[in-house]
Amino acid sequence: MSVLVIRASKRFAVRRPVTLHGPGKKRDGLMIELSSEGCRISNAERGLYAIDQEVTLQLDEAEHIPGRVRWAHDGFVGIKFARALRQTELGQLLQTSRAPEYSLAC
């Protein structure tokens, strides 16, 4: 039996290398889903992240987004941003996260 989940924000498929910073931790991952409220990261080390743990998503040298872990299992981590992205921020992030250089690098 499947369960229908209604989401507050539309999700977009992306493919962008990121670094996830937590207390005493810094790990690389791949952002595979993005919304104005948060994102999903794959290639996350199992058992490294706890629900409600504060993290910072590093997109590049200058761009960091604070948030909290909503869930973590099977090498995936769901992050809820500390504040929702504005429409322009989301649009710019989608554009750069779908750029050809990220698709080739992964």
What is each of the regions a protein language model found here?
Residues 1-106:
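Structured alpha-helical
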